Amino acid sequence: MYAIIETGGKQFRVEEGCKIFVEKLAADAGSEIAIDKVLMLGGDKFAVGAPYVENAKVTAEVIEHGRGEKVITFRKWRRNDSRKKQGHRQDYTALKIKTITA
C-alpha cells in the first residue's frame, strides 16, 4: 500500500518503511508525527481525495534534522569588474514512514 502526501508545499509518494527528506519540521528527533494531508491512497484501498482523503493518516518517525548540499549562485556584471557569489543550504527533516491508515 502506498500514499501520496503533502508536506512543506511538496508532494511525496510514500510506502511503509521508506525514508524521505522533507522541509524542516518543528519536531524533536525520535518523536512521531501524524500527517493527515493524504492526497491519494493506492493498493488495496484505492482512494483519491478532493483535495484530501477523509480519515486517512500517515504516521512517521523523525530520524534527524540536517542541512542539504550547498547551492552556489553566481552573478557577474561584464566590464565592471563586479561579481557576487552566494551559497545556500536548505534545512531538512528526515522521516521514516511507520504506518498508513485509511
From Swiss-Prot:
Assigned GO CC terms: cytoplasm; ribonucleoprotein complex; ribosome
GO terms for biological process, alphabetical: translation
InterPro entries given in the database record: bL21-like, bL21-like_sf, Ribosomal_bL21
One term of GO molecular function: structural constituent of ribosome
A Pfam family per the record: Ribosomal_L21p
Keyword annotations of the record: Ribonucleoprotein, Ribosomal protein, RNA-binding, rRNA-binding
Family statement: Belongs to the bacterial ribosomal protein bL21 family.
Assembly and oligomerization: Part of the 50S ribosomal subunit. Contacts protein L20.
Protein function: This protein binds to 23S rRNA in the presence of protein L20.
Name of the featured protein: Large ribosomal subunit protein bL21
Organism from which the protein derives: Oleidesulfovibrio alaskensis (strain ATCC BAA-1058 / DSM 17464 / G20)
Gene: rplU
